[in-house]
Every structure is written in structure tokens, then in C-alpha cells.
């Protein structure tokens, strides 16, 4: 019997203080995220850097309640998406898997196999594609499918990026307008789109489309916002000494303060769920930086989380790939090892 399922992918995050160091190890052990000239050093590097950064990272998580809310929020997104699909006649399970913390992709795909899924629609919760996020997860799925003949019989439909999905764009624009309208002088607010950064070499040497898609995404959203405010795109969360995509968010904040900007609205453009980068880096670090720079009114657009319009957009992304209710599945011949169907 044919059976569709949906798999939501995200980064993952530590839920307790004890989780922090092993989570960081998993993160830095991924060669798609941190590229070393000598791959055999990856694990030693991951152990060293996770050990060195663990204490500071624990303090950051303590500042937002002790751990990441990402798993809880992603589970809520999955429940709402499943309910939306059921209401449309698609009675399909929606699974959640994380790249670097529990529930890990490796364990969730075993559950998918046990549940008898024959077609799996994979939707990374990263609107813009990067080899370090969506690409890393797809590469892991390719390896798991190649190693397990039973998994290889499950058809995989993978959605690469969806920064231009209409309901996502509309939901972001609406959230920005709502926040702008709360300022004393809405027309004088500078809007700062802050995206998670990646090393510049990923774009210039590896051909990563992330920067191009991010810039296009901001243009689409801003057109929907329909306001005359000045706006800027910047990149946050830089790690290490290598050059990352610029301008850096912290430098833009300082520059805006020096130019006399007094009202600033930050839009976390690459984050669809609240987590450490929004709750601690933006809400605490960047807020303090802005106030020191003379920006009196600093606000942030909330992440979309389980916003109904956003969930409707996710449903629109996966719906074309689900088996039509009441109809038998079309014949499927497993693809060559490591291949997958990629959709835009």
C-alpha cells in the first residue's frame, strides 16, 4: 500500500546545559559547515572548538531560559502543518528531524521506514538554500539512502529552497508592517534584515546560491511591505577569523547609530523559528549594542513560528508532491544510488 509522509528538517539545538557541548561537537564535526583543508582533523577540531566554546554558549542559553526552544516550535509547526493537510484531505504524517541534535535525522528516517512510508516529501525549514544547511542535510539523506536498501525503495521528493513562496513572503511582509505601525514615527524607522552568515568562500568558490537567494527574498518581501522606509541587508553569527558575507550586522548597527538613526526594526530573515540567534544574539547582544550606539528604540520582528499564513505556505509547498487522496500511487523505480528529485 502506498503512503506519503512529510519530513521537516531543521538545525536542532541543546535543550539543557548538559546538551551544549555535544551539540556544538556535532555542529563543528560537519565538514559542510566547517571546511578544513585536512578532513582527518575534523573530529579533533570539533572536540577542541566545542570544548572551548561550551562555557560561553551555556551562558547564552542560560540567558534565554536554559536551552533552545527550536524542537518545541518545530514540533508545533509539524502539528499545524499536518492538521492543515488533513483538512485538505491529505491524511499524512509529518515528521521532525534535526541535523545536529535530537531527534536526529538518522533515527527519524528509521521511524519513517518502520511506518511504511513509500513517498517522502522533504522540506527543510530554511527558506534560502545553502550548502551548509539544506545541502548538508540532503547529503546525509543521500548517504543513508545509499546504505540501506529498504530506504532506497522510498521515493524522496526534496524541496531545495522556497524563499519566493507567496504566503511566506506575505506573512513576513505583514509581520514587518505590524511592527512598523507600533513605532512613534513609523516612517522614520530603519529596517534591518539580518540573515545568518556563511563564509564568503562558499559563494565565491563553491557556488553557493545563498547570498543571491537572500537578496532576492528581501526584494520580494520589501515589495509586499510597500513602505518608503530605508532598509538594509546584513549578516550575523560569524564564527572564526575567515571572511564571511558582509556587511556584518553589528557593524551596520554601529554605522546606523553614527548616522543618527533612532528607531531600528530588525527582521530575522533566515530564521522561521525563535532560537538562540533571535532570542539571545539579536534581542540581547544587538539590542545592547544599538542602545550604546544611540539608537533609542530597538525592536525585532518575531519569527513566524506557527503563523497560520506561513503554515498554509508550507502546505502549498508539499501538496503537489503528495499522493492524491483516493488514488493509487504511480509506479516508482528507485533512482540511482545517491540521487534524489530536487524541486524549486
UniProtKB/Swiss-Prot annotation:
The chain's disulfide connectivity reads none
UniProt superkingdom: Bacteria
This enzyme catalyses: heme b + 2 H(+) = protoporphyrin IX + Fe(2+)
Give the GO terms filed under biological process for this record. Answer: heme biosynthetic process
GO CC annotations?
cytoplasm
List the EC numbers from the record: 4.98.1.1
List positions binding Fe cation: 196, 277
Quote the Pfam families the UniProt record gives.
Ferrochelatase
Give the keywords, sorted.
Cytoplasm, Heme biosynthesis, Iron, Lyase, Metal-binding, Porphyrin biosynthesis
Task: From the Swiss-Prot or TrEMBL record, state where the protein is found.
Answer: Cytoplasm
Q: Which GO terms describe its molecular function?
A: ferrochelatase activity; metal ion binding
Family annotation (InterPro entries): Ferrochelatase (IPR001015), Ferrochelatase_AS (IPR019772), Ferrochelatase_C (IPR033644), Ferrochelatase_N (IPR033659)
Query: Its pathway?
Result: Porphyrin-containing compound metabolism; protoheme biosynthesis; protoheme from protoporphyrin-IX: step 1/1
Q: Which HAMAP family match?
A: Ferrochelatase (MF_00323)
Q: Which family does it belong to?
A: Belongs to the ferrochelatase family.
- Record's NCBIfam families? hemH
Its function?
Catalyzes the ferrous insertion into protoporphyrin IX.
Give the protein name, as stated in the record: Ferrochelatase
